[in-house]
A protein has these predicted regions:
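Conserved mid-domain beta->alpha element of the FAD-binding
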Residues: 8-21, 29, 173, 262-352, ...
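Active-site-adjacent segment of FAD-dependent monooxygenases/related oxidoreductases
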Residues: 40, 44-111
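Residues at the starts of beta-strands that form the adenosine-phosphate
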Residues: 2, 25, 216
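Glycine-rich FAD pyrophosphate-binding loop
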Residues: 20-40
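Conserved Rossmann-like nucleotide-cofactor binding loop
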Residues: 11, 34, 157
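Beta1/beta-strand and adjacent pyrophosphate-binding region of the FAD-binding site
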Residues: 1-9
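Conserved FAD-binding catalytic core of PHBH/FMO-like flavoproteins
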Residues: 109-110, 114-263
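Generic enzyme active-site microenvironment
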Residues: 28-29, 150, 194, 284
């Protein structure tokens, strides 16, 4: 088959890589002149790492990233611990990999280029035209095709996805900072501080960047999505003062932010395509399902989608392959979307009641067996099988 993949992000590179050893003719289209990542830090969970291993990208990713063995969160005023999820003992084989998007992108791109993946740059996809069961890609000023299959990995702003996602009231700003030698914070933990659910600040160790061997961290600050413009027009020192007031130990990190341009806005939405495919067109990653990053599953969902789709295309004829792909991922996506919808307002919302329930009901109950194991499996992405009927 002739297959077009739109979007050179995590999902696009992953599916191109996983199909590179087939007889299909694969072309990956990207809108930028040079493929490049967008964003700051993220966490690759153990299930995502297994996909990277299948792709031949895990070694580079592990060399760049930072192994995280615990997620820890405290209420800022009382110091009460309200989030504690452990992957396993420090130094063990079970961990989440904190990594910068640029580093993950480099690992994925290198692995894909080793397999001969072809990337067509400066090609902005605006739509498709279906004729005689084949798709022609509509590009800016030109067309490409026809293709037997178009894989939409264009992300949350995909022009090919019919999804209508609901904007979430809270987003965040993210920035990359150096890890200070003077800090007492652990480089093996994602740590957060909350003031009710309306303020959250956190620090995620993310390892090193391409061509920069100094240890880095992703600094993030939660805020209402409608406050972004107000924040940009407020002196940066006022924000720094408020951030340090929320968590004084982060002063060496926060003080590195000297201008608004060092922080990237992230706006989140929530939605899922009931059927992520149609005749000769299939959606993966954020083009198929979107949620808050509170559970740390965004990149993993794209990797898991890519693995399932590649498996099905290798074992079934096209129409059945798309149906089997949807079947294999449906339950996992549905449950994690529901969990994200339920938990996110406890950490990012204007509610006064939900953070009280979080601090005084959910946090204590989360320490009673079997709750710790359930929370760990939730974060790892394995609370239910990521691929129904498919081994990984």
């Amino acid at each position: 088959m002739k297959i077009a993949i739109t979007g050179c992000g995590i999902g696009g590179l992953a599916i191109a890589n996983l199909l590179a050893d087939t007889d299909h003719e694969i072309t990956l289209y990207d809108q930028f002149d040079t493929p490049a990542p967008v964003g700051s830090g993220l966490v690759i969970q153990p299930v995502g790492l297994r996909v990277l291993e299948k792709m031949g990208a895990a070694e580079d990713a592990l060399a760049y990233g930072a192994a995280g063995y615990q997620m820890l969160g405290h209420e800022s005023h009382t110091g009460r611990k309200v989030l504690d999820v452990s992957y396993g003992p420090n130094g063990g084989n079970s961990f989440g990999l904190g990594i910068h998007r640029a580093s993950l992108f480099e690992a994925l791109l290198n692995a894909s280029q080793r397999k001969g993946v072809s990337i067509t740059t400066a090609s902005r996809v605006t739509g498709t035209t279906l004729l005689n069961r084949k798709h022609t890609l509509d590009l800016t000023g030109k067309t490409a095709g026809p293709f037997d299959l178009v894989i939409d990995a264009s992300g949350a702003k995909s022009p090919l996805s019919p999804m209508t996602a609901k904007p979430l009231p809270y987003g965040a700003i993210w920035g990359t900072v150096d890890w200070p030698e003077t800090t007492s914070l652990s480089y093996s933990r994602l740590q957060q501080r909350y003031r009710r659910a309306s303020n959250m600040i956190g620090i995620l160790p993310i390892g090193t960047l391409p061509n920069d061997n100094s240890p880095k961290a992703a600094l993030f600050w939660s805020m209402p999505r409608n406050d972004f413009t107000l924040w940009e027009n407020t002196p940066i020192d006022e924000w720094r003062k408020g951030a340090i007031g929320l968590w004084s130990e982060l002063a060496p990190f926060v003080e590195q932010i000297q201008s608004h341009s060092q922080m990237t806005h992230a706006r989140y939405s929530h939605g899922t395509l009931r059927k992520p495919y149609s005749q000769g067109l299939v959606h993966i990653g954020d083009a198929a399902h979107r949620a808050s990053p509170q559970l740390g599953q965004g990149a993993n969902m794209a990797l898991l989608d890519a693995y399932a789709l590649a498996h099905c295309l290798k074992h079934y004829a096209l129409e059945q392959a798309l149906a089997e792909y949807h079947k294999s991922r449906k339950r996992h996506v549905k449950i994690y979307q529901a969990m994200s919808w339920m938990f996110t307002p406890m950490y990012q919302s204007d509610s006064r009641i939900l953070p009280i329930l979080r601090d005084w009901l959910l946090a204590p109950s989360s320490t009673v067996p079997p709750a710790p194991k359930i929370l760990t499996s939730l974060v790892k992405g394995t609370m239910v099988s990521p691929h129904r009927g498919i081994d990984i």
